[in-house]
Amino acid sequence: MDRLKNIDNAINIMLSEMETGWTNPDTLPLKQRLMRSLINIRQPDKPSQELIDAQDKELAAQREEKGVVELRQEGIHLWQGDITRLKVDAIVNAANSRLLGCFKPLHACIDNVIHSAAGIQLRCYCNEIMQAQGHKEATGQAKITPGFNLPARYVIHTVGPIIPHGKPTKEQEELLASCY
C-alpha cells in the first residue's frame, strides 16, 4: 500500500470512531497534521489492529524523515532538540496527573509531542496503568512505559509541580527535584 493510501486508511478509521466533522485533506502534510490531531483527541479505547498497523507504518515513515539520533556514550545526557528523535533507553515526559497525554490538537507541549510520535498505543497503555492504580499520579512520582513508535525504548512520565507565580516555594522545589 502506498503512503497516501496508508495514511488515508488510518485517518478514515479514526474519523469513523469520532464525530469531529473533519474531512480528510488532499496533501500529505495536511494529512499528517490531521492524523496527529486525531491521535491527540482520541480516547484511550482499544484500537483495531488495522488502525495500529496503518498508524505505525506512517509514524515509521515520519521517524525516518526526521532522522534518529543515537547517543553512543553511556550515561545521562542533556539534549536540546526534538526528544522524539533520540534512540536511547529512556526519555522523560513532563506529564499531567492523568498520564493520558495532552488532548489539545497539535499542541506544542512535550506531553503532546511525545504521545503524538509514540502513537495511540501509548495513551492506551497509560490508561491501563491509571485504571489499575485507581487515582491520579502524584506530583513528583513517575511511571515507565514502552516507547512504542519512538526510537527510545521507554518513556518515563513524571508529574511536576504547578508553579503559577514566578519563584517556587521550598516544597515545589523538592517536588520538582523528586521528578528528576
Regions found by a protein language model. Give the residues of each.
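Macrodomain-like recognition of ADP-ribose-binding/processing modules
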Residues: M1-Y180
